[in-house]
């Protein structure tokens, strides 16, 4: 057997020399020599029979199986895999290569594969060559025999989930060479090849194979960078953008568990010590994929939903009322708002996913979360009914500021058309106030938190509170316009809903005295903050007058001061623009406030 092993090793060296040939002429000569060899290594036993390829090599493999020669059991499938990889791009080898792949999938050769694939998991040297050979078979000639390979899945897919699970020692070995061949990596490459080249029912079966796909994703964050990138690109190309793959299969592929594993890749670049010469960010790549998956109903995760109307509500019908009953409107037990603590949603997968995202960690996760909210507005109230935020005191820390940015972006989201019910017309009934309020001023923004922000001597936090209150009140103003739209005989219900919404918004807003105090103590030279606070004052008077009129505030002297400053000939254009913005806001306050003393001479 020594001479056989020596001959196989020589063949292996020859194949590798073709791959590494520097001169094209040398490579061409060696390929011609290999082609002549292949022509002598193919034969048919009878008319209509499949060709027999490399009979001596296969006989050696069979002999190794019979005699338990692990050295030959390792080298033969390895050489066959190298051969297929070497000739895969050479058109003149197509016929021989396809014949060889078919021959290897015959019963006698499948028995040899079975020997390798049933070996103890610790014997990677027996299993991995078989996986590499199967990978080359499924990819050869664009998947010419991929379907035949899958039809033998009782052998060719045996224990793949087991091979995808790394040993404990491999998980603990943080110094593991990223380029080293491991059983898991070979199994992953095999799965990727099947996702690429299988089609129809075969691909659907693989995608829906829960144990395999779960094991495939399980330790993704510990996989080498190049493999992770290949996996991300395969998901994009072979799952997301495969229009022939059924939506139901995509839904199973993008299960809660698998999506959670993909989300962990946001932290890959921070934890990985592996060199990144290409400068490709794993976080950016997975972000693109998740943005696509989570915001398009075609990809199996996002489901159509009804925006601000929770699952189970029916805003198109009014219950019949007995003529002797007192009409209490939305205060009737029929309309009890039962969504303060939990909101039923259709998008269960996304509801789970958004809870594991970390908007306090990076801007990419904020972008994904806000994009999900925009695509499925039903999830906003669901998210805030479960998520605890702003547990620490307002401080200009990275986590606090990123959470602030997330809340700001959430409030900035547009009001769903017809409150999300459909694209054609407003429903009869208004949405529950407890759902709407979370889209305007989410519950992490309590009166206590916002008041502390306004009273802090930290400009960035104070300005955040001012800005976020302003956009929230402007959004409330727009919601009221929607509620005042002609709703026919149900207009009284919409008017009542507007009042109920105010009843939930008001307790979350800081008191007027705190806003006035902030405006008065803001330095005159800080024109940016003065303009922002003046705009907030105007919003209080115009949008939440019930809060504004709790305090008397005469802006006469403020107006006089602004006019004087505008008359300064040395005023810069930028400062003039800021003062004009402030003037517009203070004039709105003056036109609304009942505390103005227009005819009193300034002291």
Which residues make up each language-model segment?
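Long amphipathic alpha-helical scaffold regions
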Residues: 10-370
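Flexible helix-coil junctions and inter-repeat linker/turn elements that act as hinges
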Residues: 42-46, 84-93, 136-147, 193-204, ...
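Short inter-helical turns and helix N-cap capping residues of alpha-solenoid HEAT/ARM repeat scaffolds
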Residues: 69, 123, 180, 224, ...
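HEAT/HEAT-like alpha-solenoid repeats
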Residues: 100, 109, 156-159, 211-213, ...
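Amphipathic alpha-helical scaffolding segments
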Residues: 150-157, 205-212, 233-239, 251-257, ...
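Acidic/polar, low-complexity linker and loop regions
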Residues: 203, 330-348, 352-355, 367-373, ...
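Extended amphipathic alpha-helical scaffold segments
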Residues: 356, 389-393, 406-409, 434-485, ...
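Extended amphipathic secondary-structure runs
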Residues: 450-472, 508-560
